[in-house]
Structures are given as structure tokens and as C-alpha cells.
A protein has these predicted regions:
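N-terminal Rossmann-like NAD(P)+-binding domain of SDR-like oxidoreductases, especially those catalyzing
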Residues: 1-84
């Protein structure tokens, strides 16, 4: 059976981090969209994700940038997308 892929916007927030952890426990390949500034200082902006960070695929982007979103969706091709 093919591993499902999920893409989460808002993955750095409380709900996004809980959802990511839950989906990982179900065997999903989890991808998240984060703003570039979060990747520049991960211990400050990504602290909720630190326990699971090694199992996540994070992509730099913003919902205001159609080209960035298009590239992420094209590259990831998620089975499910969660906008939080």
C-alpha cells in the first residue's frame, strides 16, 4: 500500500503540530509549509515541531505567493491538504 502524503499549512502552530504528530503516528509522510523567517531561526519559530522535526518535510513558502504554492503542490503531490 502506498504511503499517504499530507500537506499542512500552519504546521508551526499548536493545531498544526498536533495534527502533524497524529498523521505521523498513522504512517503518513507529512509536509508542512512554513515562512522563510521560521526556517532562519528554527529554535524560536519551530519549537513545537522539534520532537518530530526529523520526520517532517518542511517547505518554505507563503499562502500569498501563488508560484511558491504551485511549486510545493507540484513537488509534493499530497493526497490530503490541511489548512490551519
Amino acid at each position: 500500500m502506498k504511503q499517504k502524503k499530507a500537506l499542512i499549512t500552519g504546521i508551526t502552530g499548536q493545531d498544526g503540530s498536533y495534527l502533524a504528530e497524529y498523521l505521523l503516528s498513522l504512517g503518513y509522510e507529512v509536509h508542512g509549509i512554513v515562512r522563510r523567517v521560521a526556517l532562519e531561526d528554527p529554535t524560536h519559530h519551530l519549537w513545537r515541531l522539534l520532537p518530530i522535526a526529523d520526520r517532517l518535510n518542511l517547505h518554505s513558502g507563503t499562502l500569498e505567493s501563488y508560484p511558491a504554492l504551485y511549486k510545493i503542490f507540484r513537488d509534493v503531490q499530497p493526497d490530503e491538504c490541511y489548512h490551519l
